[in-house]
Regions:
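Flexible, low-complexity linker and terminal segments
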Residues: 82-209
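Thiamine diphosphate
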Residues: 1-101
Length: 209
């Protein structure tokens, strides 16, 4: 694709037809893709749609270090943030399932050290997506004229509450109780940094942010 906006639009076209589709880009690329992305939150999906953002804290190879968790909050879509290579695989698989269950695009946030990491990853058997691939005409869902968008806005708010309930039961959000005097809240790679320096502290580890 010529740019990130077009890449996300092509990904959405595949999702509309029922295919599972993923778009991957750097954090600044999401700025370019923000136009269709914000509307995709209203439209929802047919086949699962995942947007992977690779953020760059400390500006290892980028022009800024924006935190794209703000995009997920802005668009009211779920975001998963893996802390190692195994979770990167597992959370991406889960992201497709959540996307189809809740009719929403899902973001997965990597950062520089996750993207450059190596590790042993346990694989599973390939899963055949359950949705047949076919073009569906659904004007009220896929055409965001104001009259339709107002209805979908209400859907987004209802979906947000359902996602909140899911997050509260999600196994990737967990507590590790050790030293009761000090607790650290982490998400993604910060969990690994914390455990390396303070192995005996207690942790709230967030996999869905």
């Amino acid at each position: 694709s010529p740019n990130e906006k077009v890449a996300l639009e092509v990904t959405f076209g595949a999702s509309m037809a029922g295919a599972r589709a993923i778009a991957c880009m750097k954090h600044v690329g999401v700025n370019v893709a923000a136009d269709p992305f914000m509307t995709l939150s209203y439209v929802g999906v047919n086949g699962g749609l995942v947007l992977v953002t690779c953020d760059d804290p400390e500006l290892y190879s980028s022009q800024n270090e924006q935190d794209n968790r703000n995009y997920a909050k802005f668009a009211k879509v779920p975001m998963f943030e893996p802390s190692d290579s195994q979770e990167a695989k597992d959370f991406t698989k889960l992201a497709f399932e959540v996307s189809e269950k809740f009719d929403t695009p899902v973001m997965v946030r990597s950062v520089t050290r996750i993207s450059h990491a190596k590790g042993i990853v346990e694989l599973q058997d390939p899963v055949v997506p359950p949705i047949p691939i076919e073009i569906q005409k659904n004007t009220a869902k896929f055409t965001m004229l104001p009259s339709y968008a107002r209805i979908r806005h209400a859907f987004v708010e209802e979906r947000f509450l359902k996602l909140k309930a899911f997050a509260e039961q999600f196994a990737g959000n967990k507590m590790e109780i050790n030293d009761p005097a000090v607790g650290i809240i982490t998400a993604g790679i910060s969990y690994q940094y914390g455990k390396e320096v303070f192995p005996n502290y207690s942790y709230l580890k967030l996999g869905m942010v």
